[in-house]
């Protein structure tokens, strides 16, 4: 009887955990959204657009399975793994 009860508790915990999905801020709307299954990392990607920053700073927020790797040296990516941890950056 104890074994059956313990098994039911473990199965319940596993099922509840599998149903959870991360929430991250996403662009262009900058609102909190549920990430697709398997994407448990929130990221903030910032870069300067245009020649010499004439068009300003750009931001991309979203979800990923793993932290994205910058393809250029002037792209900065910050990753985190709690709900809504990728807030829009504050510019100096």
From Swiss-Prot:
It comes from Oxyuranus scutellatus scutellatus. Residues 1-21 form the signal peptide. Pfam families: Toxin_cobra-type. This is Long neurotoxin 1. Gene3D superfamilies: CD59. One of its GO terms (molecular function) is ion channel regulator activity. Expressed by the venom gland. It is found in: Secreted. Its main location: secreted. Keywords: Acetylcholine receptor inhibiting toxin, Disulfide bond, Ion channel impairing toxin, Neurotoxin, Postsynaptic neurotoxin, Secreted, Signal, Toxin. One of its GO terms (cellular component) is extracellular region. Belongs to the three-finger toxin family. Long-chain subfamily. Type II alpha-neurotoxin sub-subfamily. It comes from the Eukaryota. CDD domains: TFP_snake_toxin. Disulfide bonds join 24-42, 35-63, 67-79, 80-85. Binds with high affinity to muscular (alpha-1/CHRNA1) and neuronal (alpha-7/CHRNA7) nicotinic acetylcholine receptor (nAChR) and inhibits acetylcholine from binding to the receptor, thereby impairing neuromuscular and neuronal transmission.
């Amino acid at each position: 009887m104890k074994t059956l009860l313990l098994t039911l508790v473990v199965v319940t915990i596993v099922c509840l955990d599998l149903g959870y999905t991360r929430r991250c801020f996403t662009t262009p709307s900058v609102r909190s959204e549920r990430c697709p299954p398997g994407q448990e990392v929130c990221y903030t990607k910032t870069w300067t657009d245009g020649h010499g920053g004439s068009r300003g700073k750009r931001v991309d927020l979203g979800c990923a399975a793993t932290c994205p790797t910058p393809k250029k040296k002037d792209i900065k990516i910050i990753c985190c793994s709690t709900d809504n941890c990728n807030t829009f950056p504050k510019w100096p």
